[in-house]
Amino acid sequence: MDTPKTSRREFCAHAISAVTLASLLEGCGSKGNPASPGTGGGGGTPSLSIVNATAASGRVTVNVDAASPLASVGSAALVQAGNQSFLVARTGQDTFNAMTAVCTHEGCVVTGFSSGTFVCPCHGSQYTTSGQVQNGPATRALQRFNTQFTNNVLTITL
């Protein structure tokens, strides 16, 4: 059984075609995962716990009991209400910061939190617990929302 021999020219043509095809397919991929929560904080950063909340009349309400990921000062969580996601950090016994969870760099949902810093899994932007950019590539702060905490219920006003 004779196998046809491939010439050097044919081999090079096939190799160049394969590399070109791979490059084209790479360009069709997405840049991160805009506006949908990821499974990790990126770069080994621990993921935020997800807390489900309810939204009505321009307000999001979150129950914060002893079992909540937001029960202790210095904690943070990814709060989801319908199709909206918020980063919430507990900064004091009765004080919280709430901001959009959508990274200002390319629209990925920020899902990581480590050493008091929110981390975007797509390109590594870092934000303080007040939503300010700590480290790029993002250049704009996260949009903040007013909060009120009464009787173990956190209210975020949109």
Language model: regions and residue ranges:
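Disulfide-bonded cysteine motifs in exported proteins
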Residues: 23, 98, 115-117
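Short Cys/His-rich "knuckle" micro-motifs
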Residues: 111-114, 129-131
